[in-house]
């Protein structure tokens, strides 16, 4: 069992040999210069798109599972409200330590447009943040970004503004799939950044057990990377998965030169969503999900932006308590 082998390693070596664990868990004060042990992560809200069996009393929302997913690894969350102005985005961005694009439902393109025009109610705002992240990193600041499912697809749309970037796939109702990892995965930051042995154990779980929950009608074909050099220049494909019809799609990515990661699957659902029988909740499924959360939050600790407490308090997600809806999501945070 991977956990037992990890304990053996921990007994024969010091936890100081795993700096991401040692430095982030002992206390609230940084034990390394430049390490931020109070990260604040912005989550881009989604426009109010009605789902089957529930409607949202608000202009946008976040599924609460994403909030708890980040909080469990030691971060706090600030909503980046999709209906707010670019000036508000510019205010929040230098105060946050990382950004997450969630899964859900939203349009990438302006309806009926003959050429690809980013939808003003979602994709244009997301790609604005994407460009800010790239610019910050280009200027020498470490600024991480993560995209899940819809957010994963958005990462591709932002890198390659073409209709054909996102394809149709047979991924509903939700299902689980194993990963076929590429050679890039074995040397990727995401599977070596916490500890090499731990990352290898998680890769083994993901490639042999159905721990990755998928719920999608769209995705990115591996052939799209061959069709559009913008994508292959920006991202390394870490894994390939297959939909219900056997069609391959990209499962995980890591940017080549930026701290940007994405998954077509939903690691947060294993921990916090219980309304679909297909969601895996067994031990190793939880191990995988907690690994992903801990990895991303560990990366946000490398960003040293400071959100002054008097400004942070009214922005924190706690100001919008979760609402139990017992539908597609267990709970949501809604914003008026």
Where are these regions (language model features)?
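N-terminal beta1-alpha1 cap of cysteine-dependent amidohydrolase-like domains
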Residues: 2-251, 256-257, 267-336
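Catalytic His-Asp charge-relay segment
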Residues: 259-263
């Amino acid at each position: 069992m991977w956990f037992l082998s990890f304990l053996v390693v921990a007994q024969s070596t010091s936890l100081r040999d795993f700096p991401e664990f040692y430095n982030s868990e002992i206390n609230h004060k940084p034990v390394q210069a430049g390490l931020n042990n109070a990260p604040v992560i912005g989550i881009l809200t989604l426009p109010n798109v009605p789902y089957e069996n529930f409607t949202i009393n608000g202009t946008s929302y976040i599924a609460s599972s994403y909030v708890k997913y980040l909080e469990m690894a030691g971060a706090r969350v600030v909503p980046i409200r999709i209906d707010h102005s670019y000036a508000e985005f510019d205010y929040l961005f230098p105060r946050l330590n990382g950004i997450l694009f969630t899964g859900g439902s939203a349009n990438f393109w302006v309806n009926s447009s003959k050429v690809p025009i980013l939808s003003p109610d979602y994709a244009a705002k997301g790609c604005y943040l994407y460009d800010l992240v790239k610019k910050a990193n280009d200027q020498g600041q470490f600024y991480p970004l993560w995209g899940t499912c819809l957010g994963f697809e958005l990462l591709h749309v932002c890198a390659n503004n073409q209709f054909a970037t996102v394809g149709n796939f047979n991924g509903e109702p939700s299902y689980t799939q194993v990963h076929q990892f590429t050679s890039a995965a074995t040397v990727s930051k995401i599977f070596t950044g916490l500890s090499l042995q731990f990352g290898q154990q998680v890769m083994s779980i993901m490639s042999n057990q159905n721990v990755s929950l998928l719920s999608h009608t769209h995705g990115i074909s591996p052939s799209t990377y061959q069709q559009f050099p913008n994508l292959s220049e920006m991202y390394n494909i870490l894994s390939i998965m297959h939909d219900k019809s056997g069609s391959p799609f990209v499962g995980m990515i890591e940017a080549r030169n930026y701290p940007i990661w994405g998954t077509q699957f939903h690691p947060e659902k294993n921990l916090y969503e219980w309304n679909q029988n297909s969601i895996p909740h067994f031990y190793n499924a939880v191990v995988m999900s907690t690994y992903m959360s801990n990895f991303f939050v560990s990366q946000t600790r490398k960003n040293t932006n400071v959100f002054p407490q008097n400004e942070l308090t009214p922005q924190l997600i706690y100001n919008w308590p979760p609402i139990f809806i017992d539908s597609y999501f267990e709970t949501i945070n809604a914003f008026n």
